């Protein structure tokens, strides 16, 4: 793997349930030497269906030729704004890795989607179809990259804690945009 590899880390900001209509989604492009190449800040609908298109637009933005891989904090943004990492990979040609700290309870997720967003059940089932794989102390899904290569990339970009630095920085920035300062665990 090259030393100058760049990863786009993506996470959303907090929102007030049943009140906020939109929330921020931040992308941080980080080189493996910890140099921040760029930041992309956009907004998505809470419980909407635009997060996938917004993420694709981030990847196809100004730094499109420099992004080697994308890492996301899960597959839901702004509540139940569900993304399918396979679709993102197919639309951009860039490998995508979804990361969560805890093993997703797929049955519980589908039950919640069925109850509150029945029109999104098929999308959720498709997005969750290849299930999470445990890697060290996190769970990942990947598209366009082997699990072995995904593991190498994640370990290369993880310096402290469990989340890779690009995702951790995206979380910190998104939270600061909404709350005025970073807060909580990244």
Swiss-Prot record:
Q: Which InterPro entries match?
A: Endo_dU
Q: Please give the family membership noted in the entry.
A: Belongs to the UPF0215 family.
The protein's name: UPF0215 protein PTO0905
